[in-house]
């Protein structure tokens, strides 16, 4: 009887954790989250090209990083999203070092990476 209670408790825990998956908590569907992230990366690129200061561009990149966290579809998309996020982090690092040309190149790479995520859905 005691082992039956333990087994039932374990099954209830497994069932409840399966119901509460991370896509259920996502604020946007994956396609919309990708579009939002691409738009934010593009706004960071536009700001950098227009001569905005590094802090303002860094804040825009941070917004794009935050938006990218909403992209949640599959393991393949997660890996590709992580690569794009790492590219954005590199762009912020280059901005802090004062290398706007390298930051712009990283932002272009991030834009391509996030744009290609829709093909993985």
Question: Where are the predicted features?
Answer:
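Long, charged/polar, soluble alpha-helical segments
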Residues: 2-6, 18-121
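Sec-dependent N-terminal signal peptides
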Residues: 5-13
């Amino acid at each position: 009887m005691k082992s039956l209670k333990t087994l039932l408790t374990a099954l209830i825990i497994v069932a409840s954790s399966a119901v509460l998956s991370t896509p259920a908590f996502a604020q946007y569907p994956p396609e919309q989250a990708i579009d939002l992230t691409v738009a934010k990366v593009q706004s960071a690129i536009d700001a950098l090209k227009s001569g905005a200061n590094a802090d303002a561009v860094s804040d825009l990149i941070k917004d794009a990083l935050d938006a990218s966290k909403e992209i949640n579809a599959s393991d393949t998309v997660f890996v590709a999203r992580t690569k794009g996020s790492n590219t954005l982090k590199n762009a912020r690092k280059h901005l802090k070092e004062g290398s706007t040309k390298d930051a712009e190149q990283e932002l272009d790479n991030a834009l391509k990476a996030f744009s290609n995520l829709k093909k993985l859905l």
